[in-house]
Amino acid sequence: MIIDTHIHLDDSRYNDDIDEVLNRAREGGVKRFIIPGAHPDTLERALEIVEANSDVYFAVGIHPYDMDGFDTLDFDMYVKHKKCVAIGECGLDYYRLEGTDEEKEAEKLRQKEVFIAQIELAKKHNKPLIVHIRDASRDSKKVILDNNAGEVGGVLHCYNADEELLSLANENFYFGIGGVLTFKNAKKLVNVLPKIPQDKLLIETDGPYLTPMP
């Protein structure tokens, strides 16, 4: 069975042609779709989509770029929905840190706090995690291990080819692979891929982002 484990169907760019997008994917053999959570503002749209399509599911979470919504989001209400299958996407992203060194460290600390809170939520509700990692492999791995995230496991969304993360396969984590694999600068990922157990690989598009190169 082909499952697109990460597609942002709640993105406004799909508003006008979502039925066409889903039908093309179905015709291509995709049987299930998972909408990751990223920001509270898109959750209601995600609910509309999953309730209208029996083969679409969703996750609830706060992306590290959208932490302002963390304190106001009623996680429990969404997690209890029958089609909520995961927590995330959540994690650490240091790629766009700005400001002084002190401000950057404060931002890292806040990201860790929000990530840990979502790990605890996942354990509370026995849901797997959708983990976002960018330029933060070492800290992300430490947070995952220190907080026993392997109890619920999950997927490392858009796996970044960092070999430091490979051992998380032993902690109940899978590796999400998508369009990045076709990019000209993906040689490292191509070389690392054979080191991942085949039963730990998941397919994702991350649509409408990361379109494969022709």
Regions found by a protein language model. Give the residues of each.
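Mid-domain alpha/beta scaffold segments of enzyme catalytic cores
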Residues: 1-214
